[in-house]
């Protein structure tokens, strides 16, 4: 991609005038400078609020129809996608295939830098074919500088297969055009350490992924109030959290919550429905399935019948 050989014009590659004396600062001055610059991330998210909201809407609609969400990137961008995807099963009890993170170079690139692999657009296209991306899926390409061939190859291939495509980058559209359904631009300006996009660009990207995945799960009914009622109860900490969620939302004792949790097969959402309706685990599960796992909708339907 010869048009991208010179990258000095990109916002993420430019020199930050606020950090020209970076190597002369003492530790406290360094911390204060980073703190001031990181404030740009909040502004960038605010400026991209419409695109982020559209991304949530399209992604939740696709997943509700049986689609999957894929993050794809290289280097820091790829690692952030893998991280966000990995957090979905324990937080929302989703199957691991529902939200997947793909990084150029595979698992080895998570712990060892493999920057050269990002230059192969054909590899990005190949991974889309390998994962059998289809029209119900959503593919989020993450590239801070907007030019990563691996990501562009993946997005183009995904689009050809009819998938919904979303791009997350930290450069303005006039610098790099990305042909996608939702174009999220997170403009945090030049990095304190010139070109080191693991800094502000990485931070704001993680913020955007937090919003996109959590917002999608909220729309899918994985949350009740502000509680993670689909939490996977897989260790002592999460068992304690599950009990506290049940206690908070029902006012039962911790001992009663523990009994409910076991009767529900350690499914918090089902335990809540059982307590609030008096239904058996089987009947409660049937009602939840009828309402696509939406606890609030299931409760409203039960109360109308009752």
From Swiss-Prot:
The lineage of its organism: Bacteria, Bacillati, Cyanobacteriota, Cyanophyceae, Oscillatoriophycideae. It comes from Microcystis aeruginosa (strain NIES-843 / IAM M-2473). InterPro entries: Etherase_MurQ, Glucokinase_regulatory_CS, MURQ/GCKR, SIS_dom, SIS_dom_sf. It catalyses: N-acetyl-D-muramate 6-phosphate + H2O = N-acetyl-D-glucosamine 6-phosphate + (R)-lactate. One of its GO terms (biological process) is amino sugar catabolic process. It is an enzyme of class 4 (lyase). Residues 59-222 form the SIS domain. This is N-acetylmuramic acid 6-phosphate etherase. Pfam families: GKRP-like_C, GKRP_SIS_N.
